Amino acid sequence: MPKTVVVTHPGKPINNEKRFRFELLYFCVILLMVVGLAAGYFMWMMSFSTHSPNKGLHILDRSEWLGEPPSGKYPHLKLPVSNIIIHHTATEGCEQEDVCIYRMKTIQAFHMKSFGWVDIGYNFLVGGDGQIYVGRGWHIQGQHVNGYGAISVSIAFIGTFVNMEPPARQIEAAKRLMDEGVRLHRLQPDYHIYAHRQLSPTESPGQKLFELMQNWPRFTQDPTSLRLLSNETVKIVTRPYWLAQPPIVPLTPLKLPIESVRFVATNTPSCFTQAECTFRVRLLQNWHIESNGYKDINYNFVAAGDENIYEARGWDHSCEPPKDADELVVAFIGPSSSNKKIALELIKQGIKLGHISKNYSLIDDLEKS
């Protein structure tokens, strides 16, 4: 009987083993490529984060703080912008996100309902929690300082900083926002920083924050160039702002156009903040009325050390003897080159408005005092 021969096929298991090894190798190569790409992307992101001005900057958009939509249209900013104006909100501060959101909604409601604005007036606000809250953003003109919305971006610190400094993280967040503005080409690299008080009769952004600002690299001490851009070269603090009392009796009209301007010294201590200078001007008015028997403060304007012009009798009313009734009298609290420069700008404005003759004469009694 013939034997049955069983033929085996040793090649098949060998082929399966080779295929398994090949697939394993292929899988490992793909895995290594994915891991390599992920690692490379991670390193790139780490490098980007390290060198980006955006590192640590957290911005909450309007939808995140539940802002109301604008009630109307508003004009766009021409970018990049060259000027930053720093404010404080003159409200309570906030250290936590939920409190800052509440402050944002309150400020927006106040601006829209009390001022009649179409939206919150600031471009950005900075919370004490170290976060940025978007107001009107980079693209829309603000209503933060009258006449300057088209040529500046406003950054308001949430809080009141007359007697206390903002926390370090609030200041750092504002600086990072400005760096981000340059990176995004929303700000010019050589932008200028100003305080609200340099452009308007206000304490904003508060004395303590203003003192800190003066150490910032891009802070600009002289606001003349910005005033020229806004067609405003002189900041006049009107009588209601310094809480002037009314004249005792009606004043004598000043004959226009004025042919002569006289600079005189008040011979009183200097002042360097609006609060101090307002106090000095009010003391002068009280002294002139109660001690000297004048009808009112006996100057037309007062140039003070805070680089503001304070309206006294103004353009329309003449001073009393021993002053010449036909002269415009500008008094100086602490005469200096800076407030003398502003007084000369006041004269230019007076000529432009038709109050002062183009051929006026200037009598400078400051040199005698």
Curated annotation (Swiss-Prot):
Bridged cysteine pairs (disulfide): 94-100
Keyword Transmembrane part of the UniProt annotation: yes
Keyword ATP-binding: no
Gene Ontology cellular component list: plasma membrane
Chain ranges of the N-acetylmuramoyl-L-alanine amidase domain: 80-206
Annotated compartments: Membrane
Keywords: Disulfide bond, Glycoprotein, Immunity, Innate immunity, Membrane, Transmembrane, Transmembrane helix
Identification of the protein by name: Peptidoglycan-recognition protein LF
Gene designation per UniProt: PGRP-LF
